[in-house]
């Protein structure tokens, strides 16, 4: 059984197991004590630092004495990201995807479509239908208005309307549900591909699953684009297990796995940090002779460079030379950059030494990469030494000095940055605009407004043309000094210089005005944006409206909402045939979630992504000691530049260490030039609530209000959720009312948080949940599937099935899919043992019965097995197989639970083999059921095998898995193993509950292991102290 749930390398050729690149056995943890581990780690770090210093001295000696020849042909250059054809012409991966998309129809269909598009212009019809779908009419429903239209809803029209609804998935789904009920509707693969892309962009994986089931039921065959969209959607959601399953199903469906499918899969794995799996796919590609472009190679290099597999990384660089037809010089330049970005300075220096041994010419670009890597690693002295070598060789320029300046600014050392700035100017080289901008931003943050303005004037006097980022930085500086007129003057100078303000420039302007409550000026900006045909995003409107509500500007909110309506109307016109908006859907496959999408020209440095290395460094400091004075001393010595974005990420990653991170939050808030924003306060409130430190949570809320930070519905939703999840639902209700008393209108997320906690067993309040749910419906919000499932499940559990049934009609009227609503209701009935009532509801359903059967048959099977009717359950499974619906993971899990309960281990193994045969990926619930099942049979070793194998297959154990395994181990007198699981939970950032500690404590005492029981109590006390401040 141990091998039964091991990761399926059957995805690949079995003969390749001998020379696998990666091993999946590295998940088990060492049982050494923390003290030994810290000593070993410290010694290792010291030894590595000594080795790097020695190596660096050797490299500087080599570089300092070598004579460099300037060869323009060997400089790093950008290449077209694509595979190389037989004749040497580079082929874009994007082009390949679009070719795949064209394969969705047969050749005859393609010709018919072409003729149809040539003869008929559908755009006026599409525009009119879209205006109805996206229109705002509270009196007449969308469906009623669509019925009055006299158009034929041809597949091309439907597809283009859906493309225009790309950013409003709930409206797209309502239109889709309506139009497919029309007579003569054609279930075309293009329409489903569009809907899958919309659902994927909205991160609604339930909708994706429903659409796939619907395609299968209606006999709509998937084309190659369908498969690539599904792989992309699951990859973007970091559901790697599902992505792998789709990839395998694509293989079994008879489609040839081309470069596009592999490309998306490898990118997904790289983004998820699963370099080991990416290497497996890469090796399979190489064996099949399939290649991809330079861009994916760079992603693979960056991902693998973070590991210790230096030889593998270098072999990939060799493949880049062979396949992408780039020079060794360029390939090793990319390799050097990957090492530097990953913080592998030692490996980077060793690579430089190897290149010199090969007598490869090192140009200025290599030096720049090395300087940037040293600056990122906070080795400024070493970076300056490399710059000095460049200067002696006359390779230094304003670009490399700009890198040094950025390094000092990251350390908040403005004085040294200015010294280097003077060095650039004295050398006679003009500094870059980005260097000016970065220094100005830091001066404005340090309240040195005059110096920042003087620098801007100096830049203009020296003939250096500022870009939109530089001008926006000066505008923000003026607004920080409440100089609105001057800010407008500088902002207007953009157009005078021929620079068109970007939406980012406008959004920064708006947010700065919000902080000083200049709402008349904001209305002026919105009107200007509308006149300039610049789309105003909904999050900007929400920000402004929330700020106005907080300050009691209710009259002006009406004006803002009118502008928002005009802006939405303009968006519809802008989309035209849907291409402008739907181009983002294409990027889901073509440029899916690529890290290089953010461009510095469009994004000010201060707003760029947080450096992960900085986050890791601060988290390491916070976890290194429980003595706050020592931690504070280490933070003071840190060279990291603290920004609100960085603070948010630190709080998110280290939230289990509530005491340390909240002290850090307080400490960083008192630093000169730093101020918390709303997002930072929201995250700190969440951290305090997760640690049940409600006194500190409220204290942070009041501090947030005193500091003038914008308190939105999200802030209240966080507090409501934190109170509710611990059973303090009365306080959660009072907090919700307190929010409304302050004039804030509840948002969809606020309603969801309150209803969810009111429906939970701990602190359940059904009456208040019903009242709040009805208020949410009256407010015009459509609940998501998860909320409906919680609410209907709660009503059925307390026996209030009448209200649950009446709720179905209300949901149907507001656009919630009726079939989905009934499937949730039937599921709830099955879970409380009312199987006959569930079957009665299923039989009397007047809608699309076959679709409801697909949605509910797993619940029916579960209910039958709970009652002990195995034969009827198997008959149900077989009947669904006959109509083409295979059992899902839910059905298989129910069968496994039943067979374990009946002690039929052979049947369990048989069911597992069927799952593997049908490529049905086990879920975390399946693994948990197997662990508990083996423990119930006294097979402890097999339970541990199942637990470890789930990690090897990429499924991480969650809190419930750990809790149930701990309970089973303690019942089996294996409490010492359960104690190890507590430690593993803490290592993974999962906080054990009080019940977990109590179970282990009692188990150890029953077994006579009193010393270990005291250790369990000490762990609990340490965790409480670690998570709370009050």
UniProtKB/Swiss-Prot annotation:
Organism expressing this protein natively: Arabidopsis thaliana
Disulfide cysteine pairs (residue numbers): none
Entry's localization field: Mitochondrion
Keywords, in A-Z order: Mitochondrion, Repeat, Transit peptide
PROSITE patterns: PPR
Entry's Gene Ontology cellular component terms: mitochondrion
NCBIfam families on file: PPR
InterPro entries attached to this UniProt entry: Mito_RNA_Proc_CCM1 (IPR051114), Pentatricopeptide_rpt (IPR002885), TPR-like_helical_dom_sf (IPR011990)
Protein's UniProt name: Putative pentatricopeptide repeat-containing protein At5g06400, mitochondrial
Coiled-coil region list: none
Organelle targeting sequence: 1-77
Lineage: superkingdom: Eukaryota
Family (UniProt): Belongs to the PPR family. P subfamily.
Pfam families hit by this protein: PPR (PF01535), PPR_2 (PF13041), PPR_3 (PF13812)
Start-end of each PPR repeat: 188-222, 223-257, 258-292, 293-323, 328-362, 363-393, 397-431, 432-466, 467-501, 502-536, 677-711, 712-746, 747-783, 784-814, 818-852, 853-887, 888-922, 923-957, 958-992
